[in-house]
Regions:
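Residue-level detector of flexible, active-site-proximal loop/helix-junction positions
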Residues: 139-141, 197, 255
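N-terminal ligand-binding/catalytic initiation module
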Residues: 2-188
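Glycine-rich phosphate/diphosphate-binding loop of Rossmann-like nucleotide-binding domains
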Residues: 103, 111-128, 192, 200-266
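Conserved structured catalytic cores and adjacent interaction surfaces
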Residues: 168, 173-174, 185-195, 216-220, ...
């Protein structure tokens, strides 16, 4: 059996040749999960905060902190928009979640989402040079239920520190209320990655695929396998792009969605 390359480029070669595709997929997933656990434990997560300004002598601490920083405070006080130029706010994204719908693992408790939220911040920094902060919120109310208003209030209070908000892994229907409310209430961009990000990519792929086969979006039949936040938003985007709702079918774990279902809340 071969040893893995540091780049993991030979991952498929680490397993027996007689593995079926299903066995290979399961083995790779198990391997990556165990490797992820070991690496996260070794590094203590995958994100750190590093200063980007130089310190050329001890007195430079008086520039970056007090008394020099007072000039920054009063300037921003007089014009809040200068906070985007005089602090890291313009390059800082809040990655916010209550961890109630973490990938395929469901409700992982608030802290259980940190791995994914740090992962999103990792991608932002590595691929785009944007600083992301993982913020996992306890959204339970006094009745022990997940309350979207808890997330909304938290983001509103934290807004002055960030240039944008990335909502992540919030279960439906709470995710819709959180997104719609914050987009109206905040003066910075608010983005729901699971819905809008996935929806944009899927719509782009569908448009290009239909161009290749020479078919019209309004005349094809479209099937959605799943009725979560991603697929419901994808459906809305596809309809806005010109798809015919009467030619679309959506399944959840029980079956197709239709008006005769009595197990779905209106």
């Amino acid at each position: 059996m071969k040893k893995p390359e540091l780049s993991l480029s030979n991952l498929n070669e680490l397993f027996p040749d007689d593995f079926s595709q299903e066995q290979l997929a399961k083995a790779k997933t198990l391997f990556l999960k165990e490797l992820a656990y070991s690496c996260h434990k070794f590094y203590g997560g995958k994100i750190a905060t590093m200063p980007k300004a130089g310190v050329y002598g001890f007195n430079w601490f008086n520039v970056w902190y007090t008394p020099g920083v007072s000039k920054i405070s009063t300037t921003i006080r007089d014009d809040n928009d200068t906070s985007f130029d005089l602090s890291n706010r313009g390059n800082l994204v809040a990655v916010v979640s209550d961890s109630t719908r973490v990938l395929g693992d469901g409700d992982c408790t608030p802290s259980g989402g940190l791995g994914v939220m740090e992962g999103k911040a990792f991608l932002m920094k590595y691929l785009g040079g944007v600083d992301g902060v993982a913020l996992c919120v306890n959204s339970y109310n006094d009745k022990g239920k997940h309350d979207p208003d808890k997330i909304i209030d938290f983001v509103k209070m934290a807004e002055p520190s960030f240039g944008a908000v990335n909502l992540e892994d919030i279960s439906q229907p709470n995710c819709y209320k959180v997104l719609d409310t914050l987009r109206e209430a905040c003066n910075i961009p608010v983005w729901h990655d699971d819905a809008q990000g996935t929806g944009s990519v899927t719509l782009a792929g569908l448009i290009n695929a239909l161009r290749v086969v020479g078919k019209d979006l309004g005349k094809v039949r479209i099937v959605f396998n799943g009725a979560g936040a991603s697929n419901t938003t994808i459906a809305r985007l596809i309809i806005q792009a010109g798809a015919d709702p009467s030619r679309m079918i959506m399944f959840d774990t029980t079956g197709t969605l239709h008006l005769g279902r009595d197990d779905i809340k209106a």
